[in-house]
A protein has these predicted regions:
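Glycine-rich beta-alpha junction loops
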Residues: 84, 167-169, 242-247, 284-286
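Short beta-strand-initiation
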Residues: 4, 97-99, 179, 274-277
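Alpha-helical interface/anchor segments and their boundary "cap" residues
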Residues: 18, 260-288
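Polar, surface-exposed loop/tail segments
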Residues: 232-248
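N-terminal helix-loop segment corresponding to the beta1-alpha1 unit
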Residues: 18, 22-237, 257, 261-266
Length: 288
């Protein structure tokens, strides 16, 4: 078994369209002459996404990461929050303006509105009328409950590109699960792979993977949606389930287990790249 893609666009799975290359099939591309490097410009060029307007309803990791990437490539990203439901990255370290928030939302503009009040909703809809992209990674059903789901937003902006990301997707028996990267590592199988093959529970990890991965997948599909729109395809809605972004990175593991059941085991400090692989005590005092 292999993953059938990382996302759905307008409820259609976007998967692989071509076979995998054979060994050495594209070797000539690597052995050929390198592409010439253009001479440096005397004046700095505009950033590639300059002129695009993005409305960012992101919280925590995925949506916030996607918006930051688009902003740093020149898009005008407006981050929408409310005092009732601020981006939890603001407060996770015990303050309204923390280093983690300043880092994750750099290059953006901030905007506050009460999305549950009719006036606040109308103000946000006015923003959307002039937007190219909307990003959100709220719990399943939140945007629809606020009257700001894709079906609502496309009424005021038919050419809108919207990207949504939920932990387990927006449909199915697990769609109501809420959480972020660390809560997904267990159900996605990553914690088990990181464990030692000794029967003890997985040790856990402070890494917020796959939040940043899923955020980058969202950014790629946002740009793909823009390309499709510019070619006459109109607006579209992409959904990226975080769990599928994680499983997509484990494709080789899933394929191996499918071909050789029972062959995949927790890796601990083992690595297919070399042996020994780990942290070892060396001669001397506190030398490793």
């Amino acid at each position: 078994p292999i993953m059938a893609g990382f996302a759905e666009v307008d409820s259609g799975r976007v998967g692989y369209r071509h076979r995998a290359p054979t060994l050495g099939e594209h070797q000539a591309s690597f052995d050929g002459e390198p592409f010439p490097v253009p001479a440096a410009r005397s004046e700095p060029a505009d950033l590639p996404l300059a002129g695009l307007r993005v409305i960012d309803f992101g919280h925590g990791g995925v949506g916030v990461e996607c918006g930051r990437m688009l902003a740093e490539y020149g898009a005008d990203v407006v981050k929408v929050e409310s005092w009732s439901y601020p981006d939890f990255i603001r407060i996770v370290l015990g303050g309204v303006m923390t280093a983690s928030f300043a880092s994750s939302s750099r290059s953006k503009r901030g905007f506050g509105a009460d999305l549950k009040h009719p006036d606040g909703r109308e103000v946000v809809l006015d923003l959307v009328r002039g937007a190219d992209i909307v990003i959100e990674n709220n719990s399943t059903g939140t945007m629809d409950a606020l009257g700001l789901g894709y079906r609502h937003l496309r009424e005021v902006r038919p050419e809108l590109i919207m990207v949504s990301s939920q932990l387990m997707g927006s449909r199915g028996e697990f769609s109501g699960w809420t959480g972020y990267g660390p809560t997904l590592q267990t159900v996605g199988g990553l914690s088990w792979l990181w464990a030692f093959d000794d029967g003890d529970p997985p040790p856990g990890s402070p890494a917020i993977h796959p939040d940043h991965l899923a955020g980058r997948v969202c950014a790629v599909f946002a740009l793909a949606g823009l390309l499709g729109r510019n070619r006459g395809g109109g607006g579209n809605h992409t959904e990226v389930a975080q769990v599928e972004a994680l499983l997509g990175t484990l494709g080789d593991v899933l394929l191996k287990e499918g071909l050789e059941p029972g062959s995949v085991r927790p890796r601990g400090n083992d690595s297919p790249r070399g042996a020994p692989w780990g942290v070892f005590e060396c001669a001397g005092e506190e030398e490793w």
